[in-house]
Amino acid sequence: MDVVSLTPLMERTSGRREIVIGLLDGPVAVTHPDLVSAIVREIPGKQGGTSAHASSAACLHGTFVAGILCAQRGASAPAICPSCTLLVRPIFLETIVTSDQMPSATPDALAAAIIETIEAGARVLNLSVALAQPSTRGERVLEEA
C-alpha cells in the first residue's frame, strides 16, 4: 500500500457513494462478512454479478478484488474505497475449474464489458486481466473500447 502511497489517501477519505468503480472480473460473493456494508450494484440484464458458486475460481477472484476495493475498513482486505459504489460486471464464467485453470475472457467480451460498464456510470475501472496470447486484433479491440 505504501509503495503506491495509498495509506495517506485512505487516511483522508473512504471515497463517496457517487464515485462508481467498475469491477470487471468474476462475480462477487456479496454475503462475504467483509462486504456486507459495501455498496454493490450489478449491470442489469447481464450474467449475475453475485456469485452462485462461492468456490469457483471466478467468484473467489472477483470477491478478493472487491474486498481490496470496498471491504469494511479494519477487515482482512485493504478496503481502499469502501464508501464508493462498486459496479460489478462479470467477465469470467463461473465454472468450477481445476486448480491449474485460470478464469478467462476473450478480448471481444472484455471490450464489450468495458463499454457497458462505462455506459452504466463507472468512471474508474478495475481490470485484473491480461491477454493470454499475443493478439494484434485483441489489443486493437481493447484500445477502441
Describe the residue ranges of each PLM region.
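Short gly/ser/thr-rich secondary-structure transition/capping motifs
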Residues: 1-7
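Amphipathic, non-transmembrane alpha-helical secondary structure
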Residues: 108-119, 143
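Low-complexity, polar/amphipathic intrinsically disordered segments that mediate membrane, lipid-surface
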Residues: 48-49
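Short acidic, glycine/proline-enriched helix-loop-strand junctions
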Residues: 136, 140-145
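Subtilisin-like serine protease catalytic core
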Residues: 7-43, 52-106, 120-123, 134
